[in-house]
Amino acid sequence: MTAPHTAYDFDAPGLDGSLQPLSQWRGKVLLIVNVASKCGFTPQYAGLEQLWRDYGDKGLVVLGFPCDQFGHQEPGEADEIRNFCSLTYDVTFPMFAKVEVNGAGAHPLWKWLKAEKGGLLGIDAIKWNFTKFLVGRDGKPLKRYAPTDKPESLVRDIEAALA
């Protein structure tokens, strides 16, 4: 297998367990986020959903990847995650099965994203839930955002990527 060149070269299991190739969103702008249901940043689900609703028809796809590596803040199984997101934040953007984003067991997409767009001070590791990666229509990462960056603060970059 050749080394991945774009985000579209990866796949991951959805919350329903079915394999979801990211190539189904080829040519779209992707906002890839590690999410959690019991985190201080969990209210960002509302902002992520708003971005999806405001820009989805213009070519943005928000992709949520639950992760339980930070303070055991995503302890639920797939059904619990789905129900929480739907009932609490009316999430309709694509959600995936739980992944690891750091360490030897990190999902290959997340290993690649970190290698392509390292964090502050050259430290690649994901620091906490709700780290975000904006990926351009060409499948290449444009920018990495910290958990403290609220979804609405990404609008200018998203609009530029969609232009």
State the predicted function of each range.
Residues 1-163:
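Chalcogenol-based redox active-site neighborhoods
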